[in-house]
């Protein structure tokens, strides 16, 4: 299983909606493509790269992809793993 590690750069003021943080959406993508996936804080739209340091490598399929999330402030992030069908998401924070 390949692992992508994402580390929150700063604590968001409002809740950060992270529906894109799923093995399904990371699978088969490069780190640059993962960093370009959308997230939002309130009414403002961002990319994952705006909020997270991203390293590692995604698997070819969701089943082969694990995501480790780190950083203070992860309690202010919502929807990690929302609607995922396979793989693994571990939130440490």
Summary of predicted features, one role per range:
Residues 1-93:
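Charge-rich, low-hydrophobicity low-complexity segments
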């Amino acid at each position: 299983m390949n692992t992508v590690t994402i580390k929150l750069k700063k604590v968001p003021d409002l809740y950060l909606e992270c529906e894109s943080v799923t093995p399904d959406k990371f699978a088969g993508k490069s780190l640059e493509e993962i960093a370009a996936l959308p997230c939002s804080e309130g009414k403002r739209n961002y990319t994952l790269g705006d909020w997270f340091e991203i390293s590692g490598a995604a698997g070819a399929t969701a089943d082969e992809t694990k995501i480790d999330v780190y950083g203070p402030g992860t309690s202010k992030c919502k929807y990690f793993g929302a609607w995922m069908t396979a793989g693994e998401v571990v939130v440490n924070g």
